[in-house]
């Protein structure tokens, strides 16, 4: 599936604020949650609905609810946690399935070091969240893991994506829809997205260097 770049004015505005070199941890964290929530709105807009009856103030009322599969949110640790509260603000009943993926900074290869999945994940729509889609290695490793666990429907949300990473994921898993706030220019020689956001994990957790 082709990657969807969500160019909503609110998303563009908030993402612009996140790109500032002097942004504080507090502001970066809050904006990551806000953009995560806005992307969730887009990524779930085609969920099926079913009608049921309730007792309203004026009698019986026909209302709607989401039908079919339930959702599990899959943050890729550690940076994915920064988007989690924003996503859960819209789907508070979702189960959280955490996946830890580390990238070798020399080879840029990804390896999984932790998985804590919902026990019924094979019956749920998996919504992967990670601020950055750079080389695509972490995303592919996570999707591989979820499919091995029996997931039939997987979607991914990222704040910014590099064309190189998109290409890797789309070739490895063409059935997975990616939603992003921005498709950026490229990866640099160190595997970082340009212009990107810098190291999103460091900025979310307050571990970035003063000159970062």
Curated annotation (Swiss-Prot):
SUPFAM superfamilies: PRTase-like. Uracil binds at residues 193, 198-200. It catalyses: UMP + diphosphate = 5-phospho-alpha-D-ribose 1-diphosphate + uracil. Binds 1 Mg(2+) ion per subunit. The magnesium is bound as Mg-PRPP. Keywords: Allosteric enzyme, Glycosyltransferase, GTP-binding, Magnesium, Nucleotide-binding, Transferase. Disulfide bonds: none annotated. One of its GO terms (molecular function) is magnesium ion binding. Belongs to the UPRTase family. Catalyzes the conversion of uracil and 5-phospho-alpha-D-ribose 1-diphosphate (PRPP) to UMP and diphosphate. This is Uracil phosphoribosyltransferase. It comes from Pseudomonas putida (strain W619). The gene is upp.
